[in-house]
Amino acid sequence: MREVNFSIPNVNKASVNITTTLYDRRALDCTSTLPLINSLNHLAYLTTSSARIRDILTVDGGIERLVCILKEGRSRDLMEMWKWSLAFQCVVNIGVRGSESVRTRVVEADMVPVIATILDNYIKVVDKARARADPDTQRHSSRHHAKPVPTAGEPSARPSLLEQAAHTEQRASRRQAPPPNIEIPPYFQDNHVADSNAMDISSSPRAPMTSPPERSTFGQEAHNHRTHDPRYLHPGHRQRAMQPLATALPPMDAADGFGLRPVRDTERLPSMLPGLQNGITSQPDSPTTPSGPIQARNNAATTVPVQRPTLRQQRSASGDSDDGNAESFSMEDGARSEATSEPIVQNQMEIDEVGDRQAMLNGVSDGHDLTVTDPSEGQEAETFNITHRSTVDGSTINNGNTQTNTALGLSPAQAANTTNSPNIVPSPYSLYFRDRSATASQNVLTTMPRDEDVLMSLQLLAYVSKYCNLRSYFQNSHFVPKLKVDRELQMFEDGSSPMETAEEEDEYLLPDDVNIFPLVEKFTVRHHSKDMQYWACVVMRNLCRKDESRGGIRQCAYYKCGKWEEFQRQFAKCRRCRRTKYCSKDCQKAAWVYHRHWCHTTP
């Protein structure tokens, strides 16, 4: 039997691969993971920059091969994860940057079931995390109210600087009520020990001792944050916050007029501390290696599971769009002309600025206690990006990077280094599962979709769902059995260990009874990130488009109805947004449960 991996002996190549200057369809049929990853890595660049490559992939079976790689399912092997992510990136590039005919071929290649499975998995994981987080929050809340309140003089009554910054950012970025306070031990233990032995020397006739510049800066930042926080407006706290850090030194000999003092452990280099030598490893700042933490937040080293590699996302070398519709790429072209400090994805629709939004969402937002800073809002959320910024992930650019790092106690030099190094995006729900070190939790963590996977799925849907002739593919789809995470979620619920993989049902025997629009509509709820809300709203607005091929009629916006107009303007529009149409009042009332999240007033 002939080997499927083609080789080129005359150029000393063990297998055919795709480069940035050469596309070879045979490279996608390689069964070896490493050369296939190399080819997919270069293909991700070609699909971004070359319209001809995108057109070739639609006629030579390249898209079908990429979809087959995606339908093979995820694996906990790092290389297999990388292969799946790169193949997914290639398909998204083809669909987002391609013309109408190219996008049609992406839908016809059965990409919609893959997207539907990704969205469904993410919703299930989110619901599972929130269902398990609610009892935990209530238990911590009852424990917090039961324990006595410490006095102002105790070190435990003073939250750490990181907790203060996080609390201030949460109050400024969110409008719903904050969750109950949870007692978190302070990070900087050595600072509290020093404060307990501090001696106030402000009344001494000697000149006040000075501290190094970086220490003075740190004290000023701490003072600024505490003065803005109403919890620190008490006289006792104000007096302690206004003292420079030099006052927290042990008593010194009065004959020492030069202000010299013994070097403490906190001012030594990490390599000089005997207790940290075993835990320090060098982290090369390479494009493919995530950087280590800039500043240690706790002396105890915690074990973090291996994160999946992200996608190599390349920006387009050509500024022209392959689609004649300039409206589709106006957002992308505008972002490409801006400086690198601006977000790539410009959200033209601001959901929080809609009137009466808070009153409508109180019933939904108050029920969720898994409150973690939004990755697209909180600038302290780190981003996992290997080499290039994505046209999808707008959170890779931090406009307020210097201000945020200063609030966290980092120096400006450290903040500059952070922007040049690849970081990891801490998803709120992945962090929830990561904190639980059980085997079942790690299985869910490795198989659950990442935020960027969901974001790219929604963006791809936003570009392909505006064609009414393809609407049947979205309303009559199915789930891919090998991509579902039901087994991992069941293991997490039961706390059982991995078992033998059961025989999976054949995908092509499944009925096409899945409508993808109700899944997308769930991402318009406010507990998802702003980018997810934006692209989900775009997809839902595309559902309200009129079909010009059928005489300009529209479909009822309630997904369980699906009735079409018999003539133009037969159905009544929503009075608030003037976009959606319903065949009856009953359909409008039934659809209002989720429609209220993307129903925006028109000027």
Curated annotation (Swiss-Prot):
Q: List, in alphabetical order, the GO biological process terms annotated in this UniProt record.
A: establishment or maintenance of cell polarity; positive regulation of flocculation; sporulation resulting in formation of a cellular spore; ubiquitin-dependent protein catabolic process
Q: Where is the composition biased (Polar residues)?
A: 278-319, 338-347, 382-398
- Establish whether keyword Zinc-finger is in the entry: yes
Alphabetized UniProt keyword annotations: Cytoplasm, Metal-binding, Sporulation, Zinc, Zinc-finger
Q: Give the gene that encodes this protein.
A: samB
Function field: Involved in determination of the onset of polarized growth and morphogenesis. Plays a role in the regulation of branching in hyphae and spore formation.
Q: Where are the transmembrane segments?
A: none
Origin superkingdom: Eukaryota
* Lineage of source species: Eukaryota, Fungi, Dikarya, Ascomycota, Pezizomycotina
Any keyword Iron?
no
Q: Where are the zinc fingers (MYND-type)?
A: 558-599
Q: Where is this region: Disordered?
A: 133-239, 269-347, 361-398
> Binding of Zn(2+): at which residues?
574, 577, 595, 599
Q: Name one Pfam family in it.
A: zf-MYND
Species for this entry: Aspergillus terreus (strain NIH 2624 / FGSC A1156)
One MF annotation (Gene Ontology) recorded for this entry: zinc ion binding
What is the name listed in the Swiss-Prot or TrEMBL entry for this protein?
A: MYND-type zinc finger protein samB
Family affiliation: Belongs to the MUB1/samB family.
Compartmental location: Cytoplasm
Q: Bias regions of kind Basic and acidic residues — which residues?
A: 222-232
Might you report a single GO cellular component term? MUB1-RAD6-UBR2 ubiquitin ligase complex
Checking InterPro entries in the record gives:
ARM-type_fold, MYND-type_zinc_finger, Znf_MYND
